[in-house]
Amino acid sequence: MAKNKSQYDSTLNLPKTLFEMRAGLPKKEPVMLKDWDDNDLYNQLMKHNEGKPQFILHDGPPYANGNIHMGTALNKIIKDIIIRDKNMEGFQAPYVPGFDTHGLPIELKALSSVGDKKKDISKLELRQICEKFATEHIDIMSDQFKRLGVIGDFEHPYLTLKPEFEARQIEIFGEMAKKGYIYKGLKPVYWCPDCRTALAEAEIEYGEDDCDSIFVRFHVSQDPNGVLAKHGIPMDKTYFVIWTTTTWTLPANEAICLNGQFEYSFVKIGDEFHIMATELVKSVMDACHIENYEIVGEPVPGTEFELMRYNHVYLPKEGWVILGDHVTLESGSGCVHTAGGHGVDDFNVCQKYPQVPITVPVDDGGYLTELAGKYAGQRVWAANKTILADLTESGAVMGQVHIKHQYPHCWRCHHPIIFRATEQWFCSIAKFREDVYKAIDTVTWMPDWGHDRMKGMVRDRNDWCISRQRTWGVPIPAFYCKKCGTYHITDATIKAVSDLFRKEGSDAWYKYEAEQIIPAGEVCEKCGASEWTKDTDIMDVWFDSGSTHAAVLEERPELRFPADMYMEGGDQFRGWFQSSLLTSVASKGCAPYKSVLCHGWVVDEQGKQMHKSAGNGVEPSEIIKDYGADIIRLWVASSDYTVDVRAGKNIFKQLSEAYRKIRNTARFILGNLDGFDPNTDCVADDQLQEIDRWALAALDDLMVNTSAGYAVYDFNKVYHAVYNFCVVAMSNFYLDVTKDRLYCTNGAGRKAAQTTMYKILVALDKIIAPILCFTSQEIWDFMPKTEGMNKYVVFEEMPKAG
């Protein structure tokens, strides 16, 4: 039987190829990576495309503090597909990876590594430990990115801790300060008691917390306008009713705010009178479970109560009744507990009343101070319960409702934060907000809803708090007059600090005294003195990464400003997209990017967020080990990444089947090109059969569709076009019906089919090259070559229809 089979086989032209059916990507990919590294693939590609128009995709720097995850993989692979495609589309598209290397997470890990010694080490020693930690993770993450097939200048990444970067960042700060956009002032800011530092809006995440919402009554003490007497209400039995969800802020209460446009009623309960917004009386009474009450007299405009006085609920002080437009009728009582030291609206309205003090009875660790009286020393969260218990016992609490609400948390430690008024450095967004709007309009946003999202965020944001009370970062380059305390920033001081940092790095700020840094001859503009101290704060890390348009795009010779594209996840609208936009508009008057492309989050197969505790996470290393990096790349291309992208073992298993069909299409063609020399064996178009011309027309359609997909970064469209072409047009039809010609003859019909298949495979391989970077190169290595074809498929030009 075997003999007969052998005799039969000899009469057929059966496919022959060493291109394996089983991909074996986990073993093959590292071999290819070594070849790319040995042959300096990235730099050779840049040299190959020298002189062509540039396409600059500027890399947003990931934080250098751990292994990559599926979200990072999604991000880097999208970028790599774009870079590879652009380099095949007639551009020189360099890719300079970057790393964000300063900030609290690294500092906390550094402190943890020294244990009990952390109290004994100097700031300079701590910074050196931080730098070592960051640089170690840069190498780890770079290797993980390269394992995904990402090509770029990983030998020379940009790092926010490099002296030349820090120097340029200081210059950006100086340019903004010179224009009046930087100032220092007392304002309530997001404050993390656990990290003991101020936070920016971009560093806040919201989570659901339980809390007690309470209605508290404050006893009226003075009625200078005679409002109560006018309406026959006894002052000694009258109270303002406020509502709050932050009981711990009551020690800081200095005012009660009403809205002058609302009407307020006197609500009699027993023989006592309670002032609250007329429209909210019923809801307050219901919440307090009070059934027997009476509204006395006619409603009174809120304006009539202005500058009345009341006694604090337990401290020996009086507060003021003031007016503010931020008071609404959506909840509460229409009388807002106002603590200017612990809320932005509170602070702003208190600024209109100089007689109202700003009190901050909370220290940087979240503990109440002596200003809180008997509660001094209690953490604010614990104080909630003790203050509530005491006020309930004293009769000050009218009602209490246990609720769940969205509350801000620190995105670093994930613990609840507080608002706390402190002296901080700010960037005054209000001064150049209109310029930012104009810059937003010049940018192409993908998806286009990004335009309105960014505009809305800029419209709604307060001034940017750019100072942090930590050690690992770029210092605020400000000096203070020892005599009068006025801060001092001039062109000369900025240049001195920038030059020093460029030479020695920002560690120099901690090595030298102020007099050793500040230029000779500088005098205080206020008092004329010339003795100085240095600022002790560092800049927000978003100011670091927000300076890359200057420190990287303008400084690296292979790049340019503005970038053609910034591409990151949707969270960067409040992060890197925005900080870059603000610093660029403030310093240069324009956006740092021509276009912004945004992707969604990676979620599990059910659409839920991935959490280690839930056991629903998938690590890139696991998928690479089981399937290879090309399957992760195919997952990226097959997804609509503009929304949340699902990932899971079942999804990757299905994708491996789709990959196998694409691979087997290539393998079948390679097998039938055995012995085919495209330099001598290709036939003219007029010698092709009708079915061959149909196949080439289908190829033209594929090129049109994939070209359109790549042009708008719709890789999902590219993937589906390729998959359908391989499965439907090729495997199910053309390759099937041409088997007789291929297997049974050696004449013109076979040559025509081989010519057609060769053209198809060359084009198909180039089309999939940006996505399946490993498999496309493997196919390319096995493919018969014509003169002028490059060793690496990524050096080729993307095929065009016609």
Segments and roles (model prediction):
Residues 2-25, 31, 35-39, 111-251, ...:
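Residue patterns forming the tRNA-binding/recognition surfaces of aminoacyl-tRNA synthetases
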Residues 222, 319, 353-366, 470-472, ...:
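Alpha-helical recognition segments enriched in aromatics with Gly/Pro capping
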Residues 100, 189, 193, 200-207, ...:
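Acidic, turn-prone loop/beta-hairpin segments
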Residues 2-4, 84-92, 113-123, 143, ...:
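Secondary-structure transition/capping motifs at alpha-helix termini
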Residues 49-52, 60-61, 94-107, 157-165, ...:
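Short, solvent-exposed turn/loop segments enriched in Gly/Ser/Thr/Pro and often Arg
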Residues 47-109, 169, 242-251, 257, ...:
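N-terminal catalytic cores of NTP/NDP-binding nucleotidyl/phosphoryl-transfer enzymes
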